[in-house]
Swiss-Prot record:
SUPFAM superfamilies in UniProt: Ribosomal protein S5 domain 2-like (SSF54211)
Gene behind the chain: rpsI
Annotated organism of origin: Streptomyces avermitilis (strain ATCC 31267 / DSM 46492 / JCM 5070 / NBRC 14893 / NCIMB 12804 / NRRL 8165 / MA-4680)
UniProt xrefs under InterPro entries: Ribosomal_Su5_D2-typ_SF, Ribosomal_uS9, Ribosomal_uS9_bac/plastid, Ribosomal_uS9_CS, Ribsml_uS5_D2-typ_fold_subgr
Protein name: Small ribosomal subunit protein uS9
Taxonomic lineage of the native organism: Bacteria, Bacillati, Actinomycetota, Actinomycetes, Kitasatosporales
GO biological process: translation
Record keywords, A-Z: Ribonucleoprotein, Ribosomal protein
Pfam families named in the record: Ribosomal_S9
GO CC terms of this entry: cytoplasm; small ribosomal subunit
Family: Belongs to the universal ribosomal protein uS9 family.
Domain of life: Bacteria
GO MF term list: RNA binding; structural constituent of ribosome
Length: 173
């Protein structure tokens, strides 16, 4: 059995006047935020945690609302990573989100070398920031590629070769 539907008449008071809107209304362009809009855009900072891995390094990261202090294995960022390149790499997620100085970072890092540890810490910080506010942070972090684990690792040495791929010198005679 087919039912017939009765169409309800649309009242003219419910129709919104589209002509009152313009495309030239003042809205901040993506990436252009003032200091006042950062607080309103993110609200109150929330504590969060994240785990990062790179090569053989593992970083367990906690971020808590604060003033931007870093504690890595009980040492400051400058003491733990004296190289400015590694300091900048670790700080990139905060720069992309314009959240520098809003969180204190407490991290435990083990294994690997300096470069691997910096990469692991960056991934851990990015995951913690993502967990703190998924709605506002995830898009920018994904676009920058900070939420993706870099799974490249050292290739193992093979039997009969000097290194992973380097063969001993070949002599024809």
């Amino acid at each position: 059995m087919a039912e017939t539907t009765v169409e309800q008449p649309v009242e003219e008071t419910e129709v919104v006047d589209i002509e009152s809107y313009t495309t030239e209304s003042e809205v901040p362009v993506e990436g252009e935020y003032t200091s006042e809009s950062v607080a309103s855009r993110f609200g109150e900072p929330q504590p969060a945690a994240g785990l990062g891995r790179r090569k053989n390094a593992i970083a367990r990261v906690r971020i808590v609302p604060g003033t931007g202090k870093w504690k890595i294995n009980g040492r400051t960022l400058e003491d733990y990573f004296p190289n400015k390149v590694h300091q900048q790499e670790v700080n990139e997620p905060f720069k992309v989100l314009e959240l520098e100085g809003r969180y204190d970072v407490i991290a435990r890092i083990s294994g690997g070398g300096v470069s691997g540890q910096a990469g692991a810490l960056r991934l851990g910080v990015a995951r913690a920031l993502n967990e703190a506010d998924v709605d506002n942070n995830r898009g920018a972090l994904k676009k920058a590629g900070f939420l993706k684990r870099d799974d490249r690792a050292v290739e193992r040495k093979k039997a009969g070769l000097k290194k992973a791929r380097k063969a001993p010198q070949y002599s024809k005679r």
